[in-house]
Amino acid sequence: MSGVRAVSRLLRARRLALTWAQPAASPIGARSFHFTVDGNKRSSAKVSDAISTQYPVVDHEFDAVVVGAGGAGLRAAFGLSEAGFNTACVTKLFPTRSHTVAAQGGINAALGNMEEDNWRWHFYDTVKGSDWLGDQDAIHYMTEQAPASVVELENYGMPFSRTEDGKIYQRAFGGQSLKFGKGGQAHRCCCVADRTGHSLLHTLYGRSLRYDTSYFVEYFALDLLMENGECRGVIALCIEDGSIHRIRARNTVVATGGYGRTYFSCTSAHTSTGDGTAMVTRAGLPCQDLEFVQFHPTGIYGAGCLITEGCRGEGGILINSQGERFMERYAPVAKDLASRDVVSRSMTLEIREGRGCGPEKDHVYLQLHHLPPEQLAVRLPGISETAMIFAGVDVTKEPIPVLPTVHYNMGGIPTNYKGQVLRHVNGQDQVVPGLYACGEAACASVHGANRLGANSLLDLVVFGRACALSIAESCRPGDKVPSIKPNAGEESVMNLDKLRFANGTIRTSELRLSMQKSMQSHAAVFRVGSVLQEGCEKILRLYGDLQHLKTFDRGMVWNTDLVETLELQNLMLCALQTIYGAEARKESRGAHAREDFKERVDEYDYSKPIQGQQKKPFQEHWRKHTLSYVDVKTGKVSLEYRPVIDKTLNEADCATVPPAIRSY
């Protein structure tokens, strides 16, 4: 408890624990670089002028560094510290400001508190939800670990909603069933009313304060430090004073979240800018399946704010301008609780066919007022408040205007189920030494072409923990940290300096808006080849316009203009890979719906018996992962593909789910 009290005192004083070395330009009395949970611990920081004489550069050494302090980053960081590793956590936000806090609906686990359940049924639903693009070994691992992960959170103090007999309350969520799709709707989503992400993030942060982790708060990670194909840490900018920090570590975990802000209308925080995805791209490593962008069915019309799927899990329904519960036509069994890609497309079709609501007929309604007010007050208190603030709607009396809104990135940094980052060489997966990824920044791939609601929070805690366990299996605390070249990170500092003094003709905000509107119009719920091709050309042209940016703040203390410009560079790399991957994929699968290629293209035609069919060659079908690379100088995108993993971790314990026609 002494460590916790020490941190509490530090935070109240708004200062950080001293390091051995202050940067050369640090003003007297300024807040120091970072705090540790143990206020007596000191870092091995050393001032260096090897890469810049204009910017204060400080070198640090740790066993491991985690980039990002959302759910996945915190779980990885304190898992490593718990195992005895000297761990740093670099985050551009205070941990409890991370976007995990915005998750509403819940976290899936087959606890069986509402009816009989089995993790294998959860496994089946997740594979089906992925439209058979998910890797079944990773899905096996996640769903089997789910019950223990939720119990662990409960033991950490997460205040789950309860049933009358005191068990964790579980609500219905989309795409989830019992008995391998034959037993009706499952109630598998554990929740804290409609504020589950908020509770999870604060629970994990509170738990992390038990351990001696060094937090670099409000530090912007610029790039990975790569040498000889290995990751040896990160280079970061201290936003507060402009100093540069090279954090050398034997193991680096990327947990920076998604890149929803590539789109104009999204539920993501403004800080969801794909920083880790872009860092990996600049390191010459591939990203995977970025064309699969999830549109959440129920974003508030006009504002884009998330209205949780839990509303429909509690009994809410979608209606069109005729008052019709239209999902019965598109998903006769699951209805409003079909998977998100199915519901989003159905809503879009209703609007296209003239059954939209409002003066412009450009949205539909989510009706909740038929539910008891007591149920809304207990199970959906946050939604009631959000609807009133952003839509002016009293949910007990009138429906909420909603529209599909960008919500989640299924793609990301390719990893195996242990969290190890992969590259694809000569048709084989190879682990990138020293580099791990988890959370929305990663692509394990447990979500495939479409994520099931409430599997994202599960993904965070399962794979954040997996990264820590994997590192503990292969390394020991205190192992020698590999060296880096004296000028490591020099290009990152040169880029920073170039942006700081950029004197072109385009504002960062203007270019960002052009990119967001282009992505919104060219890579939306429904996609078509000609529009995607036009989008590729436009995004590539906008990428070139990065050379013509103008920044206005030349300072180094809290230069948010500079930080937003760095974020725009990251967003552009994500946007390029997303739209080029979408244009190349000539099929419809999960969240990627092509109007000119409406069918899923598998190795067999699974609408018919496969006996007697000839298997399509790998080059002729699309049940495969996209790997994308970008030439950072030109913006040219290169694509290749790797097979989906169909085998589970133990076929005797959990059999592979063979592809089938997906319906709800």
UniProtKB/Swiss-Prot annotation:
Its main location: mitochondrion. The keyword Cytoplasm does not apply. Its EC number is 1.3.5.1, 1.1.5.-. Pathway: Carbohydrate metabolism; tricarboxylic acid cycle; fumarate from succinate (eukaryal route): step 1/1. Enol-oxaloacetate inhibits the succinate dehydrogenase activity. One of its GO terms (molecular function) is electron transfer activity. Residues 1-42 form a transit peptide. The modification N6-acetyllysine is found at residues 167, 179, 182, 335, 480, 485, 498, 517, 538, 550, 598, 608, 624, 633, 636, 647. Keywords: Acetylation, Electron transport, FAD, Flavoprotein, Membrane, Mitochondrion, Mitochondrion inner membrane, Oxidoreductase, Phosphoprotein, Transit peptide, Transport, Tricarboxylic acid cycle, Tumor suppressor. Oxaloacetate binds at H296, T308, H407, R451, A454. The modification Tele-8alpha-FAD histidine is found at H99. It is a peripheral membrane protein. It is found in: Mitochondrion inner membrane. GO terms for cellular component: mitochondrial inner membrane; nucleolus; respiratory chain complex II (succinate dehydrogenase). Its cofactor is FAD. It holds the Pfam family FAD_binding_2. Phosphorylation at Tyr-215 is important for efficient electron transfer in complex II and the prevention of ROS generation. It catalyses: a ubiquinone + succinate = a ubiquinol + fumarate; (R)-malate + a quinone = enol-oxaloacetate + a quinol; (S)-malate + a quinone = enol-oxaloacetate + a quinol. GO terms for biological process: mitochondrial electron transport, succinate to ubiquinone; nervous system development; succinate metabolic process; tricarboxylic acid cycle. FAD binds at A69, A72, T91, K92, S98, T100, G105, A221, D275, E440, S456, L457. The modification N6-succinyllysine is found at K179, K335, K485, K498, K538, K615. Belongs to the FAD-dependent oxidoreductase 2 family. FRD/SDH subfamily. Component of complex II composed of four subunits: the flavoprotein (FP) SDHA, iron-sulfur protein (IP) SDHB, and a cytochrome b560 composed of SDHC and SDHD. Interacts with SDHAF2/SDH5; interaction is required for FAD attachment. Interacts with TRAP1. Interacts with LACC1. NCBIfam families: sdhA_forward, sdhA_frdA_Gneg. This is Succinate dehydrogenase [ubiquinone] flavoprotein subunit, mitochondrial. It comes from Sus scrofa.
